[in-house]
Amino acid sequence: MAAGTLYTYPENWRAFKALIAAQYSGAQVRVLSAPPHFHFGQTNRTPEFLRKFPAGKVPAFEGDDGFCVFESNAIAYYVSNEELRGSTPEAAAQVVQWVSFADSDIVPPASTWVFPTLGIMHHNKQATENAKEEVKRILGLLDAHLKTRTFLVGERVTLADITVVCTLLWLYKQVLEPSFRQAFPNTNRWFLTCINQPQFRAVLGEVKLCEKMAQFDAKKFAESQPKKDTPRKEKGSREEKQKPQAERKEEKKAAAPAPEEEMDECEQALAAEPKAKDPFAHLPKSTFVLDEFKRKYSNEDTLSVALPYFWEHFDKDGWSLWYAEYRFPEELTQTFMSCNLITGMFQRLDKLRKNAFASVILFGTNNSSSISGIWVFRGQELAFPLSPDWQVDYESYTWRKLDPSSEETQTLVREYFAWEGAFQHVGKAFNQGKVFK
């Protein structure tokens, strides 16, 4: 079974393919998508990264065994199992067919139509109208194919479904309003069936379909473009004026800035996104440095070093402790799938890492398990309501605020942070743990 690290930027639909495939196969995929572990545009240009991935592109996957591979379809294939890849030569060929179709037929018109509505590409009316017609053709083709089929290949989800769904994702979220998509009932049924599978939801969260077709906003586009400096012209010296024209041209060429590295459409989208406001900016400064505790926790003994440091420096006025428990233990079946629920939640909370820490544990065995954990948040309230991006999973848990001074809290923090202890409140044996840091 594959295991390793996926380098990407947040909300990269190309990376979703591999993450969903891993949910089905049980591959253990860690995601690095934010500083300090991965800074898109910087980390992927370092010599160390380029030695492993010469193209410098993301997503990129590094296996625990040292195996490296880039290109999203190749990564998704690698972390898949035989069922996803196609269990017969014929099925495998059909899977490759649809994966190729997504790249060659869906990505170009989808980009042409959707990207201007996001303010990251200029609008061309004729090109957009052509793209709409091409999308209609694609949805119609899929609709005819799916008239008597639940999935694209065979009777179960394959990489074909995963890839095509991810490629259509922004169309359904941004521009395929009800009046446009109603002509393709079989395609809609299939899309909804896929995104509501637990393995898809673990990665995508709740997908909200477009209610009103988004339009190009010229003002938004203008604001997203980098502003060029226009320095004041200074009168040149007499000697400068006397320089030969050819010599002055050469100097201008030498002084011209190097063109930026070419980015694909998704990288352009990321670069064009306005910087979000810090949801925690309203809070007073705290003496507790979470990153320093995380370093202690990662690099030194938990019981003898990290925990004493935590309690010595914890700021109970600037931070809060919470106990979380999964609401629906009866729905937990295979332990690897239960563990993937935790991983999926962590992935969707990636932008919260700077202001939170958690140790979440899966207890029990197949068909008899539970999930609970201890969370540390900046401020005195749950952090999730501060951003819509963080609200996908938290309502699936019960949350109880803890008193840092109580003996119960001291015990819970020790057991959950160290992954050892009686865990008397659980009634099941420790299976495995995940840390959000």
From Swiss-Prot:
Gene: EEF1G
Name of the protein this chain belongs to: Elongation factor 1-gamma
Function, as annotated: Probably plays a role in anchoring the complex to other cellular components.
Lineage of source species: Eukaryota, Metazoa, Chordata, Craniata, Vertebrata
UniProt key word ATP-binding: no
In-chain residues carrying the UniProt-annotated modification N-acetylalanine: A2
GO cellular component, one term: nucleus
Chain residue ranges for the region called Disordered: 221-268
InterPro entries listed in its UniProt record: EF-GSTs, EF1B_G_C, EF1B_G_C_sf, Glutathione-S-Trfase_C-like, Glutathione-S-Trfase_C_sf, Glutathione_S-Trfase, Glutathione_S-Trfase_N, GST_C
Disulfide topology: none
Domain GST N-terminal stretches: 2-87
Subunit structure: EF-1 is composed of four subunits: alpha, beta, delta, and gamma.
Modification N6-acetyllysine, positions: K147, K212, K401, K434
Pfam families in the cross-refs: EF1G (PF00647), GST_C (PF00043), GST_N (PF02798)
Basic and acidic residues bias spans: 221-254
Gene Ontology MF terms: translation elongation factor activity
PROSITE patterns: EF1G_C, GST_CTER, GST_NTER
Keyword Ribosomal protein: no
Residue stretches making up the GST C-terminal domain: 88-216
Crosslink position(s): Glycyl lysine isopeptide (Lys-Gly) (interchain with G-Cter in SUMO2): K285
